[in-house]
């Protein structure tokens, strides 16, 4: 499934649908798998909630800033004049239009990037496969017990068979946990990945973090000046966000149609460009943030604390 997922959504694969959209000189109709529907729904919601600051069309800005499929980390000479929706870059819902749920329609080449929610959505999909597999196995066990009266299970075995599977999926900053006993998760210090600034407890739901510290590069403006660039952009102006250092988001399992990790992943990015109070009118979540002055904020229901 991971290969199928990347074949549809990865802008780093030459054979992906996303790459075909970026190479289509006159645009076209691009049919994605049915499983992509909820992901596109989530991007619709994030785009609206952030007033366009979260936009899959930011892929073009990332390329201009050097975060391209070749990972050149070289900023284009005219990038400053072409970044963002303010300078005419394509916009989700206008230049990329959804048709029939999972068909994207364009009229020209558009470089899209589904990284804000994509990894979290993959985690949820894998979690769904684990759950479905266990439910299918349990169903077969119960069927055998019904058709074979001599096959008896103890009370504890029956409870174990009917219980939802326990698992933790760790996708490097994106966690999905279904455990009876909460697990402790360190809040990584964005200035020093060997240290933590806090700790959280996660048991049933998703927990995602975002920070520019692990994906950043420098470009020389001149001999004296070097500009720090990272992948967390405001899609309106196309520039890397400078005021926030790290975000952490917790979302319960039932959120957004059963895609809590995708929601947490997207919100961890959205908190770089939007106020949490505005986002809370659309999404149910708890969060913590750390700004460039090391000032921490934490919501009342966040399942953790700063040191």
Residue ranges and their predicted role:
Residues 1-307:
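Mature catalytic core of soluble alpha/beta enzymes
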């Amino acid at each position: 499934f991971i290969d199928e997922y990347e074949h549809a959504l990865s802008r780093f694969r030459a054979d992906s649908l996303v790459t075909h959209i970026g190479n289509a000189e006159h645009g076209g109709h691009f049919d994605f798998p049915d499983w992509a529907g909820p992901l596109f729904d989530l991007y619709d919601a994030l785009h609206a909630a952030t007033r366009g600051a979260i936009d899959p069309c930011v892929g073009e800005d990332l390329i201009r800033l050097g975060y391209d499929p070749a990972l050149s980390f070289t900023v284009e000479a005219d990038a400053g004049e072409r970044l963002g929706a303010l300078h005419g870059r394509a916009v989700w819902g206008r230049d990329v239009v959804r048709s029939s749920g999972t068909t994207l329609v364009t009229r020209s080449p558009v470089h899209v990037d589904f990284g804000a929610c994509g990894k979290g959505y993959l985690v949820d999909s894998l979690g769904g496969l684990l759950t479905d597999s266990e439910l299918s196995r349990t169903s077969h066990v119960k069927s055998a017990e019904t058709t074979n009266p001599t096959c008896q299970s103890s009370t504890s075995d029956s409870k174990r068979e009917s219980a939802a599977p326990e698992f933790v999926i760790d996708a490097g900053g994106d966690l999905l946990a279904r455990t009876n006993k909460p697990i402790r998760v360190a809040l990584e210090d964005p200035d020093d990945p060997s240290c933590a600034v806090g700790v959280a407890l996660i048991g049933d739901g998703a927990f995602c973090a975002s920070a520019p510290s692990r994906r950043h590069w420098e470009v020389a403006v001149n001999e004296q000046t070097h500009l720090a660039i990272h992948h967390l952009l405001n899609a309106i102006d196309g520039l890397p966000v400078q005021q926030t250092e790290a975000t952490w988001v917790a979302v319960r399992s039932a959120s957004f149609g059963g895609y809590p990790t995708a929601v947490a992943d997207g919100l961890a990015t959205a908190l770089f460009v939007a106020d949490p109070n505005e986002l809370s009118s659309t999404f149910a979540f708890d969060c913590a943030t750390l700004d460039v002055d090391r000032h921490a904020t934490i919501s009342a229901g966040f399942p953790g604390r700063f040191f």
